[in-house]
């Protein structure tokens, strides 16, 4: 049985829950389905990535998305800075173009919007960021 490949994209000052929650959900779902899941933490620079709580996750670098079936983008305090990183945006665009299921948690929607993958689509983000999000990304 082939493993389902899931990537969780993080950045400096990401919200730990936004990464750990989806990781746990996919791990448990795969176990119940009897189908293995391979979950990888991804970031622009490989190595430890510090969350806003100070807890670090060890990430792989951004690699071609061919093997990934789902890409989850975390949110958090560092999201606006992360949304200006062209390597991050190019990776998200490439994943969407290849047909990878791309989703975000909370304010991770900023990265998806900046990458252009939300153009013409309805989206949501954290309620405290809604006004700014709508004005920054009206498309």
Question: What are these model-predicted stretches?
Answer:
Residues 102-103, 124:
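Structural detector of well-ordered beta-strand residues that form the stable sheet scaffold
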Residues 1-102, 110-115:
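Extended, subdomain-level signal for the structured scaffold at the beginning of enzyme domains
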